[in-house]
C-alpha cells in the first residue's frame, strides 16, 4: 500500500477501471483507457483511500505541510507528484484528515500503452516503485511543464477517438514521464547533502556486516535489507546510489567487498580462505580470480609488498 499512515485501518475503495475512477472523482469518460481528472472538483468527503487498477500519476497542490509526502525543508513546495502502478493503494489524507485542496490525476490503463514504445519501456521509470514519502516535489516552473502536458492529453481526449489517439496520447504520457525523470534527478541534486548522509549510513551498515562474526555464515545483504534499514524503498535507494556513486547496489556491494578485502590483506594476517568466506565468496580460488580481474594482481601479490 502507498500513503501516509496505515491505509488498511480505513476503508479502501477499489477502482478497477478508468471509468470507475471518473465516476468516483468527478471526471468525464472521454476515453475508456485514459483520463485527466481535476481533483478540485472531486468529492473526497466519503473516500480518501483508493486502490487503482491502472497506472496513476497524482499531482497534488496542497499547501499543507502534512499533505506533501516526505517534503523536506530543502525541497520545492509548489506541487507534489506521486506515481503508482496498477494494484497499488494510496491515501489522499494524513492522520489529521488533511486532504489535497486541489490537484490532478492522470489515470491510464496498461492496455493503452500495450504495443507502444512506452509499454515496452514503462519499467525503466523506476519512480513508479517509490514510496509516497519519496515523492517528487516540484517547482513552479516544473509544475507548469506537467500541467501543460496534462492539458495536451486533455485536448487530445476532447477529439473523437481514431486510429491516432492511442499513439499520440501515449507519446504525451511518455514525454511527461521523461520530464518526471529529469525533475527527480534535479531533486537528487537539491538533496545532495542528505543523500551523502544516507550513503554514509549505508557504508556503516556494510562495514558492520563484514566485520561481525555472523557475516561468516550469513548471506550477503540484499537491497531490500539495506533499503529497509535506511527506511527507503529499494527502487529509490538504488537510484539514489547510482546518482551519488555511479554504481548500482550490486556494483557498489561488489566494490565494498573488494575494498574490504584490500584492507584485510594489508592490515591483517587473515588467510585467503577466511577473507573469501567472510566476504561471501564461494571459495578462495573464486575470490582470487575475481580479485585479480578487479585489481590486476592476485591477492597474495597484493599483500606481499605491504
Task: Locate the predicted segments by residue.
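Short, small-residue-biased leader/transition segments that mark boundaries at the very start
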Residues: 1-8
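N-terminal regulatory/effector-sensing and dimerization cores
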Residues: 33-131, 162
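Short hydrophobic/aromatic patch on the recognition helix
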Residues: 79, 237, 241, 286-287, ...
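Amphipathic alpha-helical segments enriched in hydrophobic/aromatic residues interleaved with Lys/Arg
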Residues: 127-174, 179
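A short, Lys/Arg-enriched amphipathic alpha-helix from helix-turn-helix/homeodomain DNA-binding modules
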Residues: 170, 192-230, 251-270
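Terminal helix-turn-helix DNA-binding modules in bacterial transcription factors
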Residues: 243-285, 304-306
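…primarily DNA-binding HTH/wHTH and HhH modules…
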Residues: 289-306
Amino acid at each position: 500500500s502507498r500513503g501516509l499512515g496505515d491505509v488498511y485501518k480505513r476503508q479502501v475503495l477499489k477502482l478497477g477501471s478508468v471509468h470507475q475512477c471518473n465516476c468516483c472523482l468527478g471526471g468525464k469518460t472521454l476515453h475508456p483507457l485514459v483520463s485527466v481528472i481535476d481533483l478540485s472538483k472531486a468529492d473526497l468527503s466519503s473516500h480518501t483511500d483508493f486502490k487503482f487498477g491502472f497506472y496513476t500519476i497524482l499531482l497534488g497542490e496542497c499547501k499543507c505541510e502534512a499533505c506533501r509526502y516526505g517534503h523536506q525543508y530543502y525541497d520545492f513546495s509548489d506541487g507534489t507528484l506521486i506515481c503508482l502502478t496498477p494494484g497499488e493503494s494510496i491515501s489522499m489524507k494524513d492522520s489529521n484528515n488533511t486532504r489535497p485542496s486541489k490537484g490532478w490525476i492522470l489515470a491510464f490503463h496498461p492496455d493503452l500503452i500495450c504495443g507502444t514504445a512506452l509499454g515496452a519501456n514503462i519499467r525503466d521509470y523506476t519512480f513508479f516503485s517509490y514510496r509516497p514519502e519519496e515523492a517528487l516535489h516540484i517547482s513552479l516552473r516544473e509544475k507548469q511543464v506537467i500541467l501543460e502536458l496534462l492539458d495536451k492529453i486533455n485536448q487530445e481526449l476532447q477529439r473523437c477517438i481514431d486510429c491516432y489517439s492511442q499513439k499520440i496520447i501515449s507519446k504525451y504520457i511518455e514525454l511527461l514521464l521523461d520530464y518526471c525523470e529529469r525533475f527527480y534527478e534535479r531533486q537528487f541534486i537539491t538533496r545532495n547533502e542528505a543523500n551523502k548522509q544516507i550513503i554514509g549510513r549505508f557504508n556503516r551498515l556494510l562495514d558492520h556486516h563484514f566485520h561481525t562474526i555472523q557475516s561468516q555464515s550469513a548471506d550477503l545483504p540484499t537491497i531490500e535489507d539495506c533499503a529497509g534499514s535506511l527506511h527507503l524503498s529499494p527502487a529509490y535507494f538504488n537510484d539514489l546510489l547510482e546518482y551519488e556513486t555511479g554504481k548500482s547496489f550490486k556494483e557498489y556491494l561488489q566494490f565494498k567487498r573488494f575494498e574490504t578485502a584490500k584492507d584485510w590483506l594489508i592490515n591483517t594476517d587473515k588467510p585467503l580462505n577466511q577473507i573469501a568466506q567472510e566476504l561471501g565468496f564461494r571459495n578462495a580460488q573464486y575470490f582470487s580470480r575475481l580479485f585479480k580481474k578487479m585489481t590486476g594482481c592476485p591477492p597474495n601479490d597484493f599483500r606481499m609488498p605491504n
